[in-house]
Every structure is written in structure tokens, then in C-alpha cells.
A protein has these predicted regions:
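Conserved AMP-binding/adenylate-forming core of the ANL superfamily
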Residues: 3, 20-65, 69-73, 90-95, ...
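Gly/Ser/Thr-rich phosphate-binding loop
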Residues: 227, 252-257, 266-338, 351, ...
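Conserved structural elements of the adenylate-forming
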Residues: 37-43, 149-153, 167, 181-202, ...
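Conserved pre-ATP/AMP-binding loop-to-beta segment of ANL
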Residues: 19, 131, 136, 151-170, ...
Length: 528
């Protein structure tokens, strides 16, 4: 028997077997899984009432809220495609995403009303606008709770093709403009099963959603935690003290976040004021980590702390650096911490190789460098409306990550460098080309290049090296102010240096590796 794969099965299972359990907590609001499921049914019905058809895109601009978690199932039940948008992007980028995706409906939190009002007039499409937690204003003609109240909880779901796109996540890349990563129903279903198995979760577990749900599928948590009937607790804005209080109050078992989040937690004066004994696992991802951070998390939080690795294009989880029992009994504790700070080993259902430029596997000695390539059902369908980028990324049946790494004799992978010119700062992907384009818009700039430099707080930050036009003058502060008018705050270069010329190869291409090297001198890895 062949049954189409759909994550809607996870919601239905949770409602059937854990219906009376509190499944979602958002501030002072709690929803049982039965209530949560009903709200997703009503959302699907309401979307149809707005004219949303199967395969239409529905965008959300909001924090980690119960409404966004409801969209992970309600939008899919309507047969539409969920497109959560990074709220840290500029109005220009968000407008581009809404147009490129052809969004039929846009849901936004009331806090973002000024942003949406600014964007709406310039959109080529004319989506329906729905405001959440506020009165209809600006382009919004509907309010979320009123829309749900008018929806039916009893309409049959749309017929779903497991190979149809279910979710769309726009990720920054080397092109400057965000690319839409298209994930199918089948991909999401299998990723949830594989991640749940790898993360060893059950219905006794609970997760605090620290990772924004617009980021790489919320690391898959909306699906794999619902699958097992675990509990979702929403964190709308990151604050270390608030995070610690929620862990104690709701007996959180799993925390996922980027290194900067956990560095802030460890530095918080509130750390010693809370009972964190419920915590079992801390998964660090989104940017490279270090043994020192893993050690600090284990010693101060009394948890198993490990690194996870993945990309938007892979749903996202590919590897987890969980310890293996036979190594625990044969290796010293220090070596265990080193392994848990690596990129890890492949989760079930994922094939990972590290290959040379000729496509041969590197030696499993932890020394020879190669590119990570992946073959799995968790890999994206492709980049939305971008066949050229898709063909460049998926070649000969393998997805090419652009991440350079080594692999040891136990299969543990360690990322050493990046082939792509993407800077990962605090878990955010930053395109060096986008920053360069902003700098080139300044009349004094002749040439420039942006590279990643190590930073103790953010892991990496963008720094720029510029050559001014003959006779022109500009200070670093002036160029930074110029960028501030054109870029999201986290994309602004933290430093600008001036040179007489930039190093170039035989074809005239700027050699960013030479520019990057002085910043990383003394570091073992070229990611931080």
C-alpha cells in the first residue's frame, strides 16, 4: 500500500492521542492539542474564504507566536504553501519576497503594520492582508481571530500531492537577493521522522522555540515535536532572563539555538536563579561552535550539549554530534567534548560525503579538506523559480553545500571553511555581495570586498575592504552610515579598512581568501 506522506498526519495524531494535553503555550495563552487542531482547521477554511487556492503562497511576518505555529498546519491543510518571512530583513527584501513568491495572502503581527503599509503600495501582486493581535489598519481588511471564528472546523482538507511544495523559506545567498527554498510534503514528513529519531524525543519532551520559526523551517521543530505529541512553548523575543524563566516554569527539555544565544544565557546574572533540571539536550547550530562552549553548557546547565548542522536546503538537519556509546567508554572526556563540538555525523536517512574538487572522497583522517555533499529525501525540491541556481546546487544526484570540511575515521565531520561567500553572524546568513553592492552605491568607492571576520559575540561579522576613487575622500564612519540607510542592521559592516588596491587572480577576480586571512590568523578554523 502506498499512502501519500503529509505532516498533517502529525497534527491529527497529536489531537487523537494527546488531545487533552496542553500542546502549545504562548505567554499566558495555552492550547490543548485538540484546540490547536481545531484552530488549524478553521485557518484552512478561512484561507479558502479569502480566495486562496491549492499551491498559492501564504506569507507570515511575525514573531514566534501560536498563530505562526498554527500556520504550519492550517496553510498546508488548505493545500497552499507556507512562506514565513525573516522579520529582520529590510522592507525592500520583504517586498521582493512577497512579489517573487506571488503571495496570495499576507498575515502580519500588528507590530509590523508600519512596515507592511510601506511595502504594500509597491507590490505587483495584490494579496489579502490579515493583521494579528491588532485591529485592521492600513492594507489589512481582516483580523486573525475574527477570520478564524468565521472559518469552519469541519471542511475536508484539500487533496495533497506529497511531491507538491508545502513550505517556502527565503534564504540569503551569494547573489544578494534571497532565494526561495522549496520543501515538499514528502520532504517535511521524512525529515521530521529522521530528526525525531536522531534527537531521541518523545511525548514527555517540550521545546522552547528560541530559533525563529522563519529560520530554516524552525529547524524542523514544528513538525517533529508535534509528531511525538510533545509540548511547544513560544519565545517571541530573545531575552536570556525570559528564556531561563520559561525553562523553569514549563519544565523545558530541549533548547535549540545559535552560539550567540547560549553565550548570552551563560553570561546572564539570572542563570543561577532558576531550576533548569528539566533540561536534557541543548543543540547548538546555525553557526560553528567550540569545545569551550559545549563544555560550559554541560558544566553549568548539566545537560548533554551537542552541535547540529544543516541548511535551509536540507529541511534543515543533516548531522548531529551526539556521543556514541562505544566511544564514551574508550575515549577520555576531553575528546568527547571535542567530538560534540564538531559538525557531527549524519542522522538516519541522510548520506553525507566530503569530496575533493574531482569528486573523490577525502581521506577519513580529519585532515584532508573537501566539500560536504548530501543525498537524501530531506533535500529541497529546488530554488523557487530559479532553475539555474537549482542546477548549480544539485548535481549528479547530490546537493553541494559549499561548506568545506574534514571527516575522521568515526565519520565525524568538522567544517573548516566555506566555499560560498556567505557570512554567518549570530545564525543569520549575510550575503557579502549585497553589502558590496551597497558600498558600490557610494560615489567615492572604486572597488570593495566584504569578508567574514571572527567575533566573540556573533561568531562572525562582516568587514569590508575598500579602494576609493582617485581624488575621492570618505571615512569608514561615512561608509558605515551609508550602509545603514540601505541594509538591515545585522548586515552593516562592523569595520571598514582602506587599501590602495585589492588582490586579484588571473581573471581579475578579487581574491577574498587573501583578504580574509589576516583576520583569521591564529585561528585553527576559518569559521568561528
Amino acid at each position: 500500500m502506498i499512502v501519500p506522506l503529509s505532516v498533517l498526519e502529525f497534527r491529527d495524531r497529536a489531537a487523537a492521542y494527546f488531545g487533552g494535553r496542553i500542546g502549545v503555550i504562548d505567554g499566558e495563552r495555552s492550547l490543548t492539542y485538540r484546540e490547536y487542531a481545531e484552530r488549524t482547521h478553521r485557518l484552512a477554511s478561512a484561507l479558502r474564504g479569502l480566495g486562496v487556492q491549492p499551491h498559492d503562497r501564504v506569507s507570515f511576518i511575525t514573531y514566534n507566536t501560536h498563530q505562526l505555529l498554527e500556520a504550519y498546519y492550517g496553510v498546508l491543510e488548505a493545500g497552499a504553501v507556507l512562506n514565513p518571512i525573516n522579520i529582520r530583513l529590510t522592507a525592500d527584501d520583504i517586498g521582493y519576497i512577497l512579489d517573487h513568491s506571488g503571495s496570495k495572502a499576507v498575515f502580519y503581527h500588528a507590530d509590523f503594520a508600519p512596515l507592511v503599509e510601506r511595502i504594500a503600495p509597491s507590490l505587483t501582486a495584490h494579496p489579502a492582508f490579515v493583521v494579528m493581535e491588532g485591529e485592521p489598519q492600513g492594507p489589512a481588511t481582516h483580523e486573525y481571530e475574527g477570520l478564524l471564528a468565521a472559518g469552519s472546523p469541519d471542511e475536508p482538507p484539500a487533496e495533497l500531492d506529497e511531491n507538491a511544495v508545502a513550505e517556502l523559506f527565503y534564504t540569503s545567498g551569494t547573489t544578494g537577493r534571497p532565494k526561495g527554498v522549496a520543501l515538499t510534503h514528502r520532504t517535511l514528513y521524512l525529515h521530521a521522522l529522521q530528526a525525531a529519531l536522531a534527537l531521541r524525543i518523545s511525548d514527555t519532551d517540550s521545546i522552547l522555540h528560541v530559533v525563529p520559526l522563519f529560520h530554516v523551517n524552525g529547524w524542523g521543530a514544528p513538525h517533529w515535536m508535534t509528531l511525538v505529541g510533545g509540548q511547544h512553548v513560544m519565545l517571541r523575543r530573545f531575552d536570556p532572563a525570559a528564556l531561563l524563566a520559561l525553562v523553569e516554569r514549563h519544565r523545558i527539555t530541549h533548547l535549540l539555538g545559535v552560539p550567540t544565544v547560549f553565550n548570552a544565557v551563560l553570561a546572564s546574572p539570572a542563570l543561577e536563579q532558576h531550576d533548569l533540571s528539566s533540561l536534557r539536550y541543548v543543540i547548538v547550530g546555525g553557526a560553528p561552535s567550540s569545545p569551550a562552549l559545549i563544555r560550559a553548557l554541560e558544566e553549568r546547565l548539566h545537560v548533554t550539549a551537542v552541535v547540529g548542522y544543516g541548511l535551509s536546503e536540507t529541511s534543515p538537519v543533516l548531522t548531529i554530534a551526539l556521543p556514541r556509546q562505544h566511544l564514551l567508554t574508550t575515549e577520555p572526556p576531553e575528546r568527547r567534548l571535542e567530538r560534540q563540538a564538531t559538525t557531527g555525523w549524519a542522522i538516519p536517512g541522510v548520506r553525507v560525503r566530503v569530496v575533493t574538487g574531482e569528486g573523490r572522497d577525502v581521506r577519513p583522517d580529519g585532515e584532508q579538506l573537501g566539500e560536504i555533499i548530501v543525498r537524501s529525501n530531506v533535500v529541497m525540491e529546488g530554488y523557487y523559480r530559479d532553475p539555474e541556481a537549482t542546477a548549480a546546487a544539485i548535481r549528479d544526484g547530490w546537493f553541494h553545500t559549499g561548506d568545506m570540511a574534514t571527516i575522521d575515521d568515526e565519520g565525524y565531520i568538522t567544517i573548516k571553511d566555506r566555499a560560498k561567500d556567505v557570512i554567518i553572524s549570530g545564525g543569520e546568513n549575510i550575503s557579502s555581495v549585497e553589502i558590496e553592492n551597497a558600498l558600490y552605491a557610494h560615489p567615492a568607492v572604486f572597488e570593495c570586498a566584504v569578508v567574514a571576520a571572527p567575533d566573540d559575540t556573533w561568531g562572525e561579522v562582516p568587514v569590508a575592504v575598500a579602494v576609493l576613487k582617485p581624488g575621492a575622500a570618505a571615512t569608514a564612519d561615512e561608509l558605515i552610515a551609508h550602509c545603514r540607510e540601505r541594509l538591515a542592521s545585522f548586515k552593516i559592516p562592523k569595520r571598514i579598512e582602506f587599501r590602495d588596491q585589492l588582490p586579484k587572480g588571473g581573471t581579475g577576480k578579487i581574491l577574498k581568501s587573501e583578504l580574509r586571512e589576516p583576520f583569521w590568523r591564529g585561528y585553527e578554523k576559518r569559521v568561528h
